[in-house]
Amino acid sequence: MGQKVNPIGFRLAVNKDWRSKWYATGQDYATKLHEDLVMRKYIKEQLMSAAVSSIVIERAWNSVRITVHTARPGLVIGRKGEEIEKIRQYLQGLCGASTQVNIDIVEIRSPETDAQLIAENVAVQLERRVSFRRAMKRAVQVAMERGADGIRIRCAGRLGGADIARAEWYREGKVPLQTLRTPIDYGFAEARTLYGIIGVKCWVNKRDEVVSQQNSRPSGPRGPRRPRA
């Protein structure tokens, strides 16, 4: 089952965290969920060239805090903060005057090992008619050079303008999708080519986390066995 399910959702509360952090009931839940979708879509469209990996939304009773993880914080902030202020004002109008909107920027130190950015980079190259094999091999090589324990990239669609759609993938290193303690990063992007849409998926293994001794089973000797009746 670990081969099919979304790796991030599969590892929630283990070594991954939610990207929407708030509580609601009834009709209020649907309203806030729709607001989250609109805000994420608007930020991604406005910051299309800023290499945005993920957007985390936290809500309190009268405030919304949005954390944007990006590899190019300078493009997000803009000259004297003009770009980020324009985005904040739009989101403020969306949430209403009674809700305070704050935006934080977090820089991604190693974009070469970020699964979402890798998938988007491969998709951009496919739109520029770069060979899918060359794009995938280059992304895998760079990620392994930057310290990833393993990476897998999968492209599906009319690759190379073929009449019949197919899927091609490359993998290097270890990518254990069924091991929950392994922090697998996952990203997805779409390349809109002349022959149709090509889906790009990326899995990155960012090193096994050390399991704490409290959660591990004791390795001491077993006690004497109870004799059978």
From Swiss-Prot:
Assembly and interaction partners: Part of the 30S ribosomal subunit. Forms a tight complex with proteins S10 and S14.
Membrane spanning residue stretches: none
UniProt xrefs under SMART domains: KH (SM00322)
InterPro entries noted in UniProt: KH_dom (IPR004087), KH_dom-like_a/b (IPR015946), KH_dom_type_2 (IPR004044), KH_sf_prok-type (IPR009019), Ribosomal_S3_C_sf (IPR036419), Ribosomal_uS3_bac-typ (IPR005704), Ribosomal_uS3_C (IPR001351), Ribosomal_uS3_CS (IPR018280)
Homology family: Belongs to the universal ribosomal protein uS3 family.
Domain of life of the native organism: Bacteria
Start and end residues of each KH type-2 domain: 39-109
Keywords: Ribonucleoprotein, Ribosomal protein, RNA-binding, rRNA-binding
Function: Binds the lower part of the 30S subunit head. Binds mRNA in the 70S ribosome, positioning it for translation.
Gene transcribed to yield this protein: rpsC
HAMAP family in UniProt: Ribosomal_uS3_B
Pfam family, one: KH_2
Name of protein: Small ribosomal subunit protein uS3
Region (Disordered): 210-229
GO cellular component, one term: cytosolic small ribosomal subunit
Keyword field contains Metal-binding: no
Biological process annotations from GO: translation
GO MF, one example: mRNA binding
